[in-house]
Amino acid sequence: MTKQNSPLVLGTEPIGKLLTQYAIPAIIAMTASSLYNMADSIFIGHGVGALAISGLALTFPLMNLAAAFGSLVGVGASTLVAVKLGQKDYEGANKVLGNVLILNVVLGVAFTIAFLFLLDPVLYFFGASENTISYARDYMRIILYGNVVTHMYLGLNAVLRSSGFPRMAMYATLASVVINCALNPLFIFGFGWGIKGSAWATVISQVISLTGQLIHFSRPKQLLHFKRGIYRLRSEIVKGILSIGLSPFLMNLCSCLIVILINRGLKEHGGDMAIGA
């Protein structure tokens, strides 16, 4: 681990330099993340059709809700990790890392089970019709199957950033976006999987990025790494994560509600095609 990549530089390097080192990768990663849905829409529109784009748009509120739970754990955990590292409590920081894994699995599985059973009623509430429900259902089911991966990917990326590896977090995001863009045309046009192909492209791209994150945290030479004794959920850590992550969770929840209202309004006044416009 080089000095530049060490989390210890957070307490020694000039603040201006640290702001640049952390802000620029974060901006690039956030910009790249916005290309996810854009890429899916472009390939689905050309390969499946206009109604499929409307079906995709109907899944956005549910995907925003999944991201809200991801930020609940990710933001809270990244803040706690930074605090523990600042206190030189490296064992405590590792315990936070272990709790991130378990919390993401628990929340991801619960979210998946709940919405797999309620998927059709939820999509109809979001504004689906008989013309668009099949597209939205096909896409969202696959996304839900990979929901635990999404939660883990978002959570570990936040911890990567707060533990002194902002560039690695950026590369994980960029890799996911690039792989998604490469697999979309292959699965939609090459294999003829339709909207399901786009969903599989999203899940597989996140699996690959998550694999890189897991490899990083599996190395004993890293200050933060997987090891025995860190995976038991501890009430003080869980409370800290949830209390800190509550604000970004509520912000994402509001974003989810806004998209629902917009979609329902578009359906009422413009029909199915307006939702995908």
Map each language-model feature to its residues.
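Helix-loop interface residues and adjacent transmembrane-helix termini in multi-pass membrane transporters
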Residues: 35-38, 47-50, 84-87, 162-163, ...
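Short alpha-helical transmembrane segments in multi-pass integral membrane proteins
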Residues: 1-23, 81-148, 190-245
